[in-house]
């Protein structure tokens, strides 16, 4: 296929038009008085959002060169979202400022490689200073403040703070759509996995359609049980103890399932069978997690164990097990704390090594189930459009809060970027490197300027006053007052600010050092089909 090629100034100008188109659409959402953007959807109602990365992903431009520029900045938003989960609009604003300022200098004859060096030096210094001024997050109220700022909703802030308090920092907090109008929190204590009872005849509570086992023994195996003789020895031992039994196996079927159901209905013993969660290697790992949590063993041929040799000593124990049609929850497993801690450490090590987003999510879930529990925030709203928008905001707030727990908090509203201004300005450099540093200095002002503009104020006036203020004092765009940002609860996670700056600088440096751009040539439109008017089939009338 033929290609279009543009060089130097012409190439960069075309891409800059794309950068500006995307960034201008995204930056109207910045700050407490930022506006929304409406996105057309092929199916269903339009999506109304103020989430930078969601807007950036939707933008596709007709001109191939402009589109490349737009996609580069969308990459900044996307990468920041992957690393920190929030701050995508800030990252976009920073990238646009660095690219525009840099391009002016390249056009005036500056060497792009020198500019790149200066940009990298400035960003390294800014990040070091951010680490110095960040404060560790302490207590439920600090967590609530971070979440409330991100979601622009105090009620959401309180919900997220409560969820994190209940399940711990390692706990899993998921979002679901609620059937009602209100947003509420539902916490599942203990370990839950998505497998229900093998037969509805096993339930103990017909109103709730669930089976509740108090102080049960738990048989854990990766084998399929189809013959009752295989588990008869261990079954007899459990009956003698007078305790209920939970069987977690690859499957329980045929004669084995029929015998268990008949004896359950007769009242001989209380037993519930469920399928093992997960698939393949993940199934083995999850069964091992359950075994460690309950102090039992996984009965598997890989370890030379078969079901006939199982005894009550090899079974797990728990304070309570609740089995519904779709889920099984094990509460108060009696496993040893040392073993559980060791397992958690093992999963954390795997988390650090994995590069797959899917694996990371699954490992995080396993970690949460062992460490604390799972909290579900059920998001409610009056309309579907509002529900989608609210869900996106809560997701950002959740990510922000996790980032704050990880690396601490800094003054919000773009103030922290201005607080590192002096440190960056003090770097000694010459020539194009010094110009590169000035590009970053100009970009550091941009988020505050944009927040002020969105609040209907003159951005440059706010920026100039902020340069003279003490560290931590900033402009509250919601009220129009100058306040101590940390004391007023206007905070950003340091990780979000750091990621936004790093990713923006990375793409800006790549952009400025671009000398040629190659794109597919648009294909000429195919000629229209000829008129088919003369090809009537009247002569075929006799074939009826």
Curated annotation (Swiss-Prot):
Keywords: ATP-binding, Chaperone, Cytoplasm, Isomerase, Nucleotide-binding. It comes from the Bacteria. Gene3D superfamilies: GroEL (3.50.7.10), GroEL-like equatorial domain (1.10.560.10), TCP-1-like chaperonin intermediate domain (3.30.260.10). ATP binds at residues 29-32, 86-90, 413, 476-478, 492. It catalyses: ATP + H2O + a folded polypeptide = ADP + phosphate + an unfolded polypeptide. The keyword Phosphoprotein does not apply. Together with its co-chaperonin GroES, plays an essential role in assisting protein folding. The GroEL-GroES system forms a nano-cage that allows encapsulation of the non-native substrate proteins and provides a physical environment optimized to promote and accelerate protein folding. Forms a cylinder of 14 subunits composed of two heptameric rings stacked back-to-back. Interacts with the co-chaperonin GroES. Belongs to the chaperonin (HSP60) family. This is Chaperonin GroEL. It comes from Bacillus cereus (strain B4264). The gene is groEL.
């Amino acid at each position: 296929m033929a290609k279009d090629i543009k060089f130097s100034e012409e190439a960069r100008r075309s891409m800059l038009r794309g950068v500006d188109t995307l960034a201008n659409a995204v930056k109207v959402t910045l700050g407490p008085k930022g506006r929304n953007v409406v996105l057309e959807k092929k199916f269903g109602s339009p999506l109304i959002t103020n989430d930078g990365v969601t807007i950036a992903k939707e933008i596709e431009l007709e001109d191939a060169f402009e589109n490349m520029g737009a996609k580069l900045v969308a990459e900044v938003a996307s990468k920041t979202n992957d690393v920190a989960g929030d701050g995508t609009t800030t990252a976009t604003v920073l990238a646009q400022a660095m690219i525009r300022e840099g391009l002016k200098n390249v056009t005036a004859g500056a060497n792009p490689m020198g500019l790149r060096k200066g940009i990298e030096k400035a960003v390294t210094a800014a990040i070091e200073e951010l680490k110095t001024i960040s404060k560790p997050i302490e207590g439920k109220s600090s967590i609530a403040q971070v979440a409330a700022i991100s979601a622009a909703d105090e009620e959401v802030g309180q919900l997220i703070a409560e969820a994190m308090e209940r399940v711990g920092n390692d706990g899993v907090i998921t979002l679901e759509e609620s059937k009602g109008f209100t947003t509420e929190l539902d916490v599942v204590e203990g370990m839950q996995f998505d497998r229900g009872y093998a037969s509805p005849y096993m339930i103990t509570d017909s109103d709730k359609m669930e089976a509740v086992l108090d102080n049960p023994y738990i048989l854990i195996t990766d084998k399929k049980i189809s013959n009752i003789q295989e588990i008869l020895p261990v079954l007899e031992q459990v009956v003698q103890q007078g305790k209920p039994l939970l069987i977690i196996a690859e499957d329980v079927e045929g004669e084995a399932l029929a015998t268990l159901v008949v004896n359950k209905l007769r009242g001989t013993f209380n037993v519930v069978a469920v399928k093992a969660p997960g698939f393949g290697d993940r199934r083995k790992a999850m069964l091992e997690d359950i075994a460690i949590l309950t102090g039992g063993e996984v009965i598997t041929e890989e370890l030379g164990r078969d079901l006939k040799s199982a005894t009550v000593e090899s079974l797990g124990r728990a304070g309570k097990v609740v089995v519904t049609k779709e889920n099984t929850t094990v509460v108060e497993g009696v496993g040893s704390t040392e073993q559980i801690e060791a397992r958690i450490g093992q999963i954390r090590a795997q988390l650090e090594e994995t590069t797959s987003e899917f694996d990371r999510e699954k490992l995080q879930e396993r970690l949460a189930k062992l460490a604390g529990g799972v909290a579900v925030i059920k998001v409610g709203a009056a309309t579907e459009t509002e529900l989608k928008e609210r869900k996106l905001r809560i997701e950002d707030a959740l990510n922000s809060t996790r980032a704050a727990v990880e690396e601490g908090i800094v003054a919000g509203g773009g103030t922290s970027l201005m607080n590192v201004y002096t440190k960056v300005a003090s770097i000694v450099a010459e020539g194009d490197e010094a110009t590169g540093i000035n590009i970053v200095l100009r970009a550091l002002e941009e988020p505050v300027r944009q927040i002020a503009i969105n609040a209907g104020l003159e951005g440059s006036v706010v920026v100039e006053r902020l340069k003279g203020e003490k560290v931590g004092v900033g402009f509250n765009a919601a009220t129009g007052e100058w306040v101590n940002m940390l004391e007023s609860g206007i905070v950003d996670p340091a990780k979000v600010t750091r990621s936004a700056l790093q990713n923006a600088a990375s793409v800006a440096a790549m952009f400025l050092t671009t000398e040629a751009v190659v794109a597919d040539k648009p294909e000429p439109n195919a000629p229209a089909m000829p008129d088919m008017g003369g090809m009537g089939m009247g002569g075929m009338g006799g074939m009826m």
